[in-house]
C-alpha cells in the first residue's frame, strides 16, 4: 500500500492525523537533521500499521516534508 505523508518536525507532541484527502500528517519531536525526523516517522508508521521496520519503505521526499511511503505485508 502506498501512502502520502506530511511530516511536521520539532513538534511538542508526537501524534498522527489523517485529513479529508487521505493524507497522513505525522508530528514528530525530532529535528530534520541527519535523517532523524525520517527515522522517527518510520518508527511511528511501524507502530500505526503494526508491522516491522523493514516493511516501511520511503519512496520519495527524503529531504522534503511531503513524503511517499510504501507499506509491505499485512496490516
What are these regions (language model features)?
Residues 1, 12-13:
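Residue-level marker for the onset of beta-strands and adjacent loop->beta junctions
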Residues 1-3, 20-24, 52-54, 65-67:
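A generic structural signal for short beta-strands and their flanking turns/coil linkers
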Residues 4-8, 57-58:
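Short, Lys/Arg-enriched charge-dense amphipathic segments
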Residues 6, 11, 21-22, 26-35, ...:
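Compact, glycine-rich, soluble single-domain proteins
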Residues 16-17:
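A structural signal for short hydrophobic beta-strand segments in well-ordered beta-sheet cores
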Residues 42-75:
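C-terminal structural segments of small proteins and small subunits
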Amino acid at each position: 500500500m502506498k501512502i502520502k505523508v506530511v511530516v511536521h518536525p520539532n513538534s511538542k507532541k508526537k501524534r498522527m492525523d489523517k485529513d479529508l484527502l487521505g493524507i497522513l500528517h505525522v508530528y514528530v519531536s525530532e529535528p530534520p537533521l541527519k535523517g532523524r525526523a525520517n527515522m522517527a516517522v518510520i518508527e511511528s508508521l511501524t507502530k500505526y500499521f503494526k508491522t516491522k521496520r523493514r516493511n516501511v519503505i520511503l519512496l520519495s521526499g527524503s529531504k522534503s516534508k511531503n513524503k511517499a511511503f510504501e507499506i509491505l505485508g499485512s496490516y
